[in-house]
């Protein structure tokens, strides 16, 4: 991935261009990287909130200082998703190199304490957990941590493996290759199987206290098997992704060029960019015939199902994001559309 941060002149241009979308309600700061590492992150959040947008963001939690927490609250940020992949400090350090679990938990508690002092409900705290072979034993412990920090939701996602080594950590199931998930994986999908597989307590709920009322917390599990049902939340929710350099992409999965491994198959994804807000308006980009046609194809999911095709091991199309129906890019084996990899 190309590293960088959006300069404020470009951000102000984006903010002005968003006025062309009167039905736009939410702006989410996330993707690949840490939003709060931006040198003007808090100013960006304030400007978005002042413009009337519901703001949410992902963070690893290390930069949620007391000053940052106060800004998040005062700006009316709706949800903060904290990435926590373990409740064990040693496991956490292996996954989040350079991070300290105690520091992240302390930062969450500071945020919650400030909310209480200021008598406000937002931002809600959600814990995001990337499920892997090496931390699967930590998943049943997440509801307890969520209860302690006042989080009403634990959002679980599978790993997007960028290398063969990372692929060894994958737990979701692939047709014809039912690793540890068991022979009955296709016959027993859903929550019941998730509880059985990962030893979560039943029922998985906890009280998340917010001032004068109580929300019942829950774990939102990802899909753990490959299936024929596919849905793109990015397209169906009328979302677009704007990179730090102003480039516009339909989704996280196509915003950069990168390798990943799927069913022991190396795949190269090429970025799919429809334009750049620095040189043309987001409204014009959104209404380009190419973009309109792409959204139509994805809404109707006019793509083959590559993963359960008997010839996929000998198909050159599957090595890149193309397919035998002539789609380029192709969303045929997108992990997001399967609900296997999930984003807020």
Language-model segment annotations:
Residues 1-56, 62-75:
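Conserved Radical SAM active-site core
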Residues 1-2, 6-12, 51-54, 74-280:
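Radical SAM enzyme [4Fe-4S]-AdoMet core and its adjacent flexible, acidic
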Residues 15, 68, 96, 252, ...:
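Short, flexible helix/strand-to-coil boundary loops that buttress conserved ligand/catalytic motifs
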Residues 22, 75, 149, 304, ...:
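Structured loop/turn residues at beta-strand edges in well-structured enzyme cores
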Residues 30, 58, 128-130, 309:
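Short hydrophobic segments within beta-strands
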Residues 35-36, 60-64, 86, 131-135:
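Short beta->alpha connector loops
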Residues 38-41, 67-68, 91-92, 166, ...:
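Short glycine-/acidic-enriched loop or helix-start segments at secondary-structure transitions
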Residues 247-248, 253-344:
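Flexible mid-to-C-terminal extensions adjoining Fe-S/redox cofactors in radical SAM and related proteins
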């Amino acid at each position: 991935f190309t590293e960088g941060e959006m300069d404020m002149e470009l951000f102000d241009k984006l903010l002005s261009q968003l006025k062309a979308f009167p039905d736009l309600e939410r702006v989410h700061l996330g993707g690949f990287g840490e939003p709060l590492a931006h040198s003007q992150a808090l100013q960006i959040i304030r400007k978005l909130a002042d413009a009337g947008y519901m703001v949410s963001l992902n963070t690893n939690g290390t930069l949620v200082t007391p000053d940052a927490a106060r800004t998040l609250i005062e700006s009316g940020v709706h949800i903060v998703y904290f990435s926590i992949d373990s409740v064990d400090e040693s496991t956490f350090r292996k996954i989040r190199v350079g991070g300290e679990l105690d520091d992240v938990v302390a930062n969450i508690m500071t945020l919650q304490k400030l909310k209480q002092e200021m008598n406000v409900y937002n931002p809600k705290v959600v814990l995001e957990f990337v499920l892997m072979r090496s931390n699967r034993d930590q998943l049943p412990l997440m509801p307890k941590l969520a209860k302690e920090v006042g989080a009403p939701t634990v959002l679980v996602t599978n790993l997007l493996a960028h290398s063969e080594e990372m692929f060894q950590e994958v737990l979701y199931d692939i047709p014809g290759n039912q690793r540890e998930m068991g022979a009955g994986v296709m016959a027993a999908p859903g929550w019941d199987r998730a509880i059985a597989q990962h030893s979560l307590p039943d029922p998985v709920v906890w009280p998340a206290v917010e001032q004068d009322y109580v929300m019942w917390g829950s774990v939102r599990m990802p899909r753990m098997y490959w299936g024929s049902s596919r849905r793109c939340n990015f397209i169906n929710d009328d979302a677009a992704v704007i990179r730090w350099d102003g480039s516009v992409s339909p989704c996280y999965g196509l915003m950069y060029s990168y390798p990943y491994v799927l069913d022991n198959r190396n795949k190269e994804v090429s970025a799919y960019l429809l334009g750049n807000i620095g040189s043309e308006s987001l409204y014009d980009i959104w209404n380009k015939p190419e973009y309109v046609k792409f959204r139509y194809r994805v809404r109707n999911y006019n793509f083959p199902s590559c993963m359960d095709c008997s010839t996929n091991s000998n198909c050159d199309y599957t090595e890149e994001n193309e397919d035998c129906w002539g789609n380029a890019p192709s969303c045929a084996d997108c992990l997001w559309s399967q609900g296997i990899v999930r984003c807020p």
